[in-house]
Regions:
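Thiamine diphosphate
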Residues: 1-113
């Protein structure tokens, strides 16, 4: 699942992984405070969920979304990646340093799959 500016990087990673034989999907989380219960039921049944965001990994959507999945009975593997180093977020050139480029997202997915 991706939100905001991380979406296109996550899409690139998902396309490359699917082409190489690792079958994964991608969900665009368009709103931070509203949950689509039909989609949440599908995610609860998934073997793993990775949240990719351009916000701080400690305070962004990922930490909150993981809690919402647990409330609904999620038992799979979970991780969230986002900005994690002071002073190196914002510009696309810095996303690789944060692990938020296509390669970093692919590595995070493979670690869960």
């Amino acid at each position: 699942m991706a939100v905001g500016e991380a979406l296109y990087r996550a899409l690139d990673a998902v396309i490359k992984l699917n082409e190489s034989g690792t079958k994964v999907g991608l969900i665009n989380k368009a709103t931070l405070n509203v949950y689509d219960e039909t989609m949440m039921k599908k995610l609860v049944a998934a073997p793993f969920v990775l949240v990719v965001e351009g916000f701080n990994v400690k305070t962004g959507l990922g930490s909150r979304f993981g809690t919402e999945l647990l409330k609904r009975g999620f038992k799979g593997k979970y991780n969230n990646i986002g900005t994690n180093r002071e002073g190196s977020g914002g510009l696309w050139q810095q996303m690789g340093y944060q692990g938020l480029d296509s390669d970093g997202i692919s590595k995070a997915i493979k670690a869960l799959a």
